[in-house]
């Protein structure tokens, strides 16, 4: 009888440990969400990709004009996915920070990515945890990090490009260039 009690006592200690190994930390769960996002994009699986976003999510692309609601972003990406065209971004490095809130329901991240098309890229964003425990992307921003030594030349080229675009728009419309967009 003593052996049976000892066995039961040891099982009671082991079962919680085994369960803990199966339960990911919030940071691991967020990493899995982001890994799934990149895998779905590479496989052009639109439904799986967009299911990872919160309903009011925003995607900020690399062009200064690209600030898309989820609906707008779907309008851009779904035709590509429907043709089997996705995009490949492989995480090289990732940092996840969980907000110090009692709910443990908000986190932000930054990740360095290897892009099949663009080389080194960076993704940053915010995730929120739903009532059911799933992490959803509330904001994702994609950028191209520029080495500091190249920044003066590249930002100069961007400035020249924008001036040429503004001049072309002014000539074609007969209107002055628009004022810079204000953030709300």
Model-identified regions with their sequence ranges:
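Surface-exposed, charged secondary-structure patches
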Residues: 22, 29, 59, 72-120, ...
């Amino acid at each position: 009888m003593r052996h049976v009690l000892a066995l039961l006592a040891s099982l009671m200690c082991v079962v919680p440990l085994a369960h803990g190994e199966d339960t990911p930390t919030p940071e691991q769960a967020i990493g899995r969400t982001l890994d799934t996002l990149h895998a779905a994009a590479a496989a052009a699986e639109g439904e799986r990709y967009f299911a990872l976003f919160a309903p009011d999510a925003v995607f900020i692309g690399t062009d200064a004009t690209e600030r898309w609601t989820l609906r707008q972003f779907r309008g851009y990406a779904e035709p590509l996915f429907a043709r089997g065209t996705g995009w490949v971004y492989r995480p090289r490095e990732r940092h996840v920070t969980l907000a110090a809130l009692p709910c443990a329901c908000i986190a932000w991240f930054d990740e360095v990515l290897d892009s099949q098309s663009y080389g080194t890229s960076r993704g940053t964003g915010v995730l929120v945890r739903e009532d059911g425990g799933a992490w959803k992307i509330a904001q994702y921003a994609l950028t191209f990090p520029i080495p500091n030594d190249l920044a003066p030349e590249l930002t100069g080229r961007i400035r020249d490009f924008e001036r040429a675009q503004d001049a072309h728009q002014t000539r074609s419309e007969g209107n002055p260039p628009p004022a810079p967009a204000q953030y709300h």
